[in-house]
Each structure stands twice: as C-alpha cells, then as structure tokens.
C-alpha cells in the first residue's frame, strides 16, 4: 500500500512539529536562570545569549510556520476563523509573537551586556548583581511563565476544540 498524505495532513504535521521544536526549546528557558544562579552568576551572560538564540531562531520561525499552516488548515478544513477555539488560539499566538518580538528578544539584548559588565567588574571575586539587573531578570521570568501558560492553553484549545 503506497504512502499517501494529503496537503492538509502535511500542513498539520508541520504545524505540530513547529510547536514542538520552536516552543519546546523555550520551555527549557524556565530552568536556565535558576541553574546558572546555583552554579555561578558568571554563567548568566550565556543564559541570555542562549535565550536570544532560541527566541530568534526557533520561536520566531515556529510562529511563522504555526500561523501559515493554521490559516491553511482553516481554509481547507471544516473550520471558521470565528470558531471560539480558533479565535482564542490565534489571539494567543499573536500575543506570544508580540511578547517575543517586542519584549523577550529586546530584554535579552539588554540583559546580556548588562550582566557581562557586572561579571567583568567583579574580576575574580564574587559577582554582585545590580538591583536593576535582578529586577529586569525577575520581570522576564514572570513574563516567561505567563507565556508558557498561554502556550499550554493554546495547545489545549487545538486539541479539545471547545465549541466545535
């Protein structure tokens, strides 16, 4: 029996793969900062560079693929953009995209050099993180938690399709 896959099924495969690859890596960000702090604040520049890389090269392309394949699935499937589960998931994806582009990426671009300076200023001694750095890093952690919850809600909407 030959392997046959429809364009809709392929789109669904791309959609799910983009979510797993693009956003799965970002869930690991929630443990990067605490692990770095347990080891040494000297690892924090790496944490911010890694988060920047994950957000720019994994999450942003994933958002594009998720949106493109999602719109394709709505147009080819028996769905309407006005369906609650689709509208809510689309709103969540837009919020996550905006958070990523307007908050997370700029925050890591700001925090990485800030903490690099603080590490350099410490020389061989203990690193003392500034109040500004701690405040901004805490804010980023809270925003990351909210984003993670939004992602889980979007996945639930896609799987359960309430109202469909």
Model-derived segments and spans:
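Polytopic transmembrane helical bundles with strong interfacial aromatic enrichment
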Residues: 1-164
